[in-house]
Amino acid sequence: MAVYTDINEIELGAFLRHYDIGTLTSYKGIAEGVENSNYLLHTSSGSFILTLYEKRTNREDLPFFLGLMQHLAKRGLECPQPVVRNDGAMIGQLAGRPAAIVTFLEGMWMRRPTVAHCEAVGEGLAHMHLAGADFPMRRRNGLTLPDWRPLWNLSRKCADTVEQGLVAETEADLDFLEKNWPADLPQGVIHADLFPDNAFFLGDRLSGFIDFYFACTDILAYDVAVCLNAWCFEKDFSYNRTKGAALLRGYTSVRPLSEAEADALPVLARGAAVRFMLTRLYDWLTVPAGSFVVKKDPMEYVRGMRFHRQIESAAEYGLEMQEVAA
C-alpha cells in the first residue's frame, strides 16, 4: 500500500456521501507498498480502507479483483470485502482516479515471521487456491514470463549502476527461464504478491490476506514459489530451510503438490525472484524523490536469484516426499 494521489477532506466527504458507512471522523495515508494510493478511514460505524487505483492498475481488472474478494469470503477465506455504494456499484471516482472502499481486516503483519507464521501462511494459501477453484472470472498474469524481458528492457541500460554485472546475470537468468519454464501445471486463481505485509495475524493465528491487486489466473505452484521467496529468507539473505519446510508442510496439508509441481519448484522460485527483482529495479530507478512511497531494494532479489540457481530439487527448500501426491 502507498500514497501517490493526495486527497482533501472536502472531496473525500463528497465521495463518501455515496456510501452508507457513517460519518468520517479521521483519515490518513498508508505509506507502505508501491502500487496504489491507500487511506485508512475511521467513521462513526468503523474502520475502512480507501484505495485510489493508479496508472499501473487497469480499471478493466477491478471487477476481477473486487469480485474475487467477495467470492473468497463466501467460501470462508478471511479477506477485506468491497463496500457497495448506494447505487449498487463497487467502484467510484475520486481525485480523478477510480476508487473503492473495502472493510478493515483486524490484525497486523509480521516483520519477523516465525516458523509458525510460515506454516499458517502455507495452509492459508492452499485454502485460497481451493476456494478460488470455482471463481468464474479469469485474468492473465501481467507479470509473468512473457512480460519479464520487456520490463527488463526498461531498466537494462542503468542496471549496472545498481550492481556491476547485473545486466549479464539477468540476461542469463531470463535465457534460462525462457528455455525451462514449466508447461501444463495446474492453474487457478493465485494471489501473486503474498508478502508478509499482505498477511495479517492475531498472535500466531492467521487473520486473513489483503491486497489482491496482483491476483490472476496462473500456475498454482508459482504462488508457493513466491511465498518461499517472500517468507523464508532472513535479513542476511540466507534461506531458512526450517521456515521453508513449515510453509510447504502447511500448504501440502491442505493441497498436496503433484510430482510435476514439486519438480518445477526450483525453476518457479527462480522465476519469482527475477520477477520481483525486475519490478523493484524499475521502481528503484524511476520512482521520483519525495514520493510518499517506500522503495524496496532490488538487490534482495538479486541474491535470491543467485540462491535459486544452485537448487536442484524441491527437497532443498524443505519439501518432504510424503507431501507430494502420488
Curated annotation (Swiss-Prot):
The name under which this protein is listed is Homoserine kinase
CDD domains linked: HomoserineK_II
Name the UniProt key words of this record, in alphabetical order.
Amino-acid biosynthesis, ATP-binding, Kinase, Nucleotide-binding, Threonine biosynthesis, Transferase
Q: Which reaction does it catalyse?
A: L-homoserine + ATP = O-phospho-L-homoserine + ADP + H(+)
Name of encoding gene: thrB
Q: Does the keyword Transferase apply?
A: yes
Q: Which Gene3D superfamilies is this protein grouped with?
A: 3.90.1200.10, Phosphorylase Kinase, domain 1
Q: Which PANTHER family match?
A: AMINOGLYCOSIDE PHOSPHOTRANSFERASE DOMAIN-CONTAINING PROTEIN (PTHR21064:SF6), AMINOGLYCOSIDE PHOSPHOTRANSFERASE DOMAIN-CONTAINING PROTEIN-RELATED (PTHR21064)
What is the species listed in this Swiss-Prot or TrEMBL entry?
Brucella ovis (strain ATCC 25840 / 63/290 / NCTC 10512)
| A GO term, aspect molecular function | ATP binding
Tell me which EC number(s) this protein carries: 2.7.1.39
Q: Which protein family is named in the record?
A: Belongs to the pseudomonas-type ThrB family.
- Which pathway does the record list? Amino-acid biosynthesis; L-threonine biosynthesis; L-threonine from L-aspartate: step 4/5
Gene Ontology terms: biological process: threonine biosynthetic process
Q: What class of enzyme is it?
A: transferase
Give the matching NCBIfam families: PRK05231.1, thrB_alt
